[in-house]
C-alpha cells in the first residue's frame, strides 16, 4: 500500500454544491462525476451529494454508469454523456441509464431498441452550439425539427448543449452559443433544457435553464469554490550532500551549496508529472520546499536545507496538494489545468474520506 494519502473532504464538496445551488436559485443542479469523480471517487461523492438532494449524475460511459447505479440504487438519474452504441444499448436499458444522444445514428440505435422493447426509452439530446466535440449538427437538428418521427419511441427529457469558454465571463462566444441554443429550443417548447457547466453557472441566470451540470466547481476548480483535496507524502530518506553533488536521473540538478535532500515516495507512475522536475514545489509546515532533480517513476527529491532542523525527519509529511498548493496553482506551474492534476491522481494512493 502506498505511503501517500489523498484526503477528500466531502463536506467541502457538499458546501460547494450548496453554493452553486444558491447561485442557480430555481434551477436544479446536477453533478458531473465522470472519470471517477474527477479522480476523487464518484461513488463517495455522489452519495454525499444525494444528502443535499442532488438527483442528476453525469458520467462519460456506460461502464461508469453501471458502476454508479450498482452503488446508488434506482432513486437517481444517471446520464451517459457519450451516448449509446450498439454494443451497450441493452446494458443502458438494464441499468436504467439515460443516454445523451449526440447524433442521428445514436437516435436511430435508441429507436431500434425502443421498438425491440416495445416501450418509450428516456434520452437527452445534445445540440452542438459551437464547442464542436459531441452533439447534433445544425443539419441534423433541422432534420429533427422537420421530421418529428425521428424521435418516435423516445422519451425526450432534456435538450442540452455545452459551453466552450464559459470560464471567460466577457467572451462574446458565450452569448453566441446561448442565442443559438435558445433559437433551437423554440422548436421544442415543452422540453426541459440544460446549458450551464461550472463556468456557465456564473454567467447569469439566462444560462441556467432547468438544470445546471457543474463538475470542476464542485471539486474546487473555480475561484469561488473551495479545494476539497489534500495529498500528503512522508519523507522516506534523508541525505546530506556537499556542494556540486548531482541529483536524480541525467544529473539535471547540481547542488550550489552543502544541502539536505529529502526523498518522497511518489512519481510519474502516480500521476505526478515529470514536468515538475526542477520547478515544482511542496509544502512542509506552510513553508515552500523546491523539487530538485528529475521526477522519477516512484520518487521525487526535495531540498529541505532551509527548513529548521527540528522539522526535518523521517516520516515528516509534505503537502503536495492542499491549501498552499491547490490543483489550479500546481497546474499553472507546468502549463496545464487543475482538471488534469486531479484526474491523474494515481490508483496507488490511499484515499481517505472525511466530512
Curated annotation (Swiss-Prot):
It comes from the Bacteria. This is Alanine racemase. PROSITE patterns: ALANINE_RACEMASE (PS00395). Its cofactor is pyridoxal 5'-phosphate. InterPro entries: Ala_racemase, Ala_racemase/Decarboxylase_C, Ala_racemase_C, Ala_racemase_N, Ala_racemase_pyridoxalP-BS, PLP-binding_barrel. The modification N6-(pyridoxal phosphate)lysine is found at residue 34. GO terms for cellular component: cytosol. Pathway: Amino-acid biosynthesis; D-alanine biosynthesis; D-alanine from L-alanine: step 1/1. Its EC number is 5.1.1.1. Substrate binds at residues 133, 297. Keywords: Isomerase, Pyridoxal phosphate.
